[in-house]
Amino acid sequence: MGNDEAKKKDHKFQIDYGFRIYKIYNNSPFKMLGVKELSDFIIPPKELSSSNLTFEYWLKEKINEKINIKIYSLLTRKMKEFEITVNEDDNKGGILGCEVNYENYISAQTKLLHVISIKNKSFAQDNVFLIKDQDYIIGLKSLNDGKLYSLNTDKFKELIIEFSEVLSRNKGKECELYVYNVKRGAKVILIKMPNNKKFSLGCDVAYGKIHEFPMKSENDEDEEKKGLKD
C-alpha cells in the first residue's frame, strides 16, 4: 500500500484504528472517488481480527477482484463504503496506490497542532508558507531515514517535544511536513532545514478540543465529488 504499515504482522486490528492516507498516487483506485489525503482512513475488514493475514496479504488475495472498502472521514466524522477493483502492485503506492500509516481515527480529531500565529520573517512564514488559523500540522517525514512522525499517537505530548528535536536533527536535510488547510485540503510541504545552531519554526501552535480537526457537512463533500467528475 505504499509503505510497510500494511505489511507489519504486529498490528492487532483494534476498534477505532485504520490506515490514514498520507499520499494518493495517480494509479490509485481511490483517485477518482473523492477519497482525501490526511483526512481519510482505510478501515480494515473485521475478518482480519481473527486471521493471521495482514491487510497487505489480504489485498493480494483479491487482485483483479471488486471489493468493498470502508473509509472513515475526519471531515464528516462518518464512515462510507466504496467499491474498488484491486490492481496489481506496480511498486508506486503498492496495491492501493497510496501511502498510509496505522493510526486511531478517533484520536486524530484532536492529536494535531493548529497554527494560531506566525512570527514575521520566520522560517514558518518565508519557507514553509504556513497560514495562521487555517493550517493544522499532522506529521513530519524525515527524508534522510524515511521515518514518519505522526502526531496522532498515544504519546502525543512527548512527540510534540520530539517533533522539534527531529527538525533540529535534520539541519541541512530535506523533510516533508504534512499539513491540512481548511480551505485547500492536504498539503505536503517539502522543506530543507537550515543549518542554524538554534532553529525555530517560528509559529505558535495549540491543541485540544477547540483546536480539533475541522468538520465539513456531507453536502460540501458531495459538491466536491461532483466537481471531480465534471
Please provide the spans of the model-predicted regions.
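Intrinsically disordered, Ser/Thr/Pro/Gly-rich linkers and terminal tails that flank
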Residues: 1-230
